[in-house]
């Protein structure tokens, strides 16, 4: 059975942040919930798989392991297929949106007067060596803080009115047959309150943007696509609560070294005479020079592995390997002297230098018999 990719299952990209993952999960879970698809076994299995995907992708540690090693890497980390342990709160809110259950508790839990997320995600660009060995990086970004005149409401003098669309309930209801469905009010976003006159200071946004900069230690071994959390550097709510800042790592490719997880690959050009004679050559590594023993008769694209010469695992799993792939190169042109020397060398091998003749001779005879 083909393993289902969690990102494909939720129909999101691998660089999606937590809010995108949660939004996709809620949409897919509502679509395939068994109570909306009675008797549909396929929808039920899809619903279980969606929950399994969310349990992994909503957990930073599990997500990092999954991104590197796939589903197999989660074995031994408490992951079980089809479970619900990772999303009871989200499942509860889905029930509320589908059937209108628990409206008052949801309103109490989610009701807020500001209209921005507390967590912030920005991209941090790293050179190849900065990601491999770690570095101290200066971060320049903007965060949001509640507008003081309106206290983050976006309303003039901070005064909000009862939302006319949902009458202060935070939800709107619709009927489909005998079922009644409740959804978050599109106007007030579930707060039950709406702006009549906008605050002049923030023009109704409810926040002000503040520039900030600081230095952060990037750990050794981070990779492209990883996220680093910096606590208490996100947006600030009117009550002083502050979110986190997430650094989305983007690593520039190196012109020679190619990284795959914690392993490093590069191609070493070898002249054909070195392959014929064998010998030792010096090759570059992440931390200096190494000696590579080229055996006589080595093949083009043959790989040689140096254990523990790769990238140090950011999760403490040791170091990856350095894999060198040789590329046999031949002269593009020969002068008269070189041509004469090669012809003499070929003649010195006798019939051994013409393996095609002995191979093809038997094939020619076989083909002739087919038509005789």
From Swiss-Prot:
Subcellular location: Cytoplasm
Zinc finger (CR-type): 134-211
CXXCXGXG motif repeats: 147-154, 163-170, 185-192, 199-206
Residue stretches making up the J domain: 5-70
Alphabetical list of Pfam families matching this protein: DnaJ (PF00226), DnaJ_C (PF01556), DnaJ_CXXCXGXG (PF00684)
Binding residues annotated for Zn(2+) 1, in chain numbering: 147, 150, 199, 202
Quaternary structure annotation from Swiss-Prot or TrEMBL: Homodimer.
Record text about domains: The J domain is necessary and sufficient to stimulate DnaK ATPase activity. Zinc center 1 plays an important role in the autonomous, DnaK-independent chaperone activity of DnaJ. Zinc center 2 is essential for interaction with DnaK and for DnaJ activity.
PANTHER family: CHAPERONE PROTEIN DNAJ, DNAJ HOMOLOG 1, MITOCHONDRIAL-RELATED
Record's function text: Participates actively in the response to hyperosmotic and heat shock by preventing the aggregation of stress-denatured proteins and by disaggregating proteins, also in an autonomous, DnaK-independent fashion. Unfolded proteins bind initially to DnaJ; upon interaction with the DnaJ-bound protein, DnaK hydrolyzes its bound ATP, resulting in the formation of a stable complex. GrpE releases ADP from DnaK; ATP binding to DnaK triggers the release of the substrate protein, thus completing the reaction cycle.
Protein name in the entry: Chaperone protein DnaJ
Native source species: Aliarcobacter butzleri (strain RM4018) (Arcobacter butzleri)
Lineage: Bacteria, Pseudomonadati, Campylobacterota, Epsilonproteobacteria, Campylobacterales
Gene name tied to this protein: dnaJ
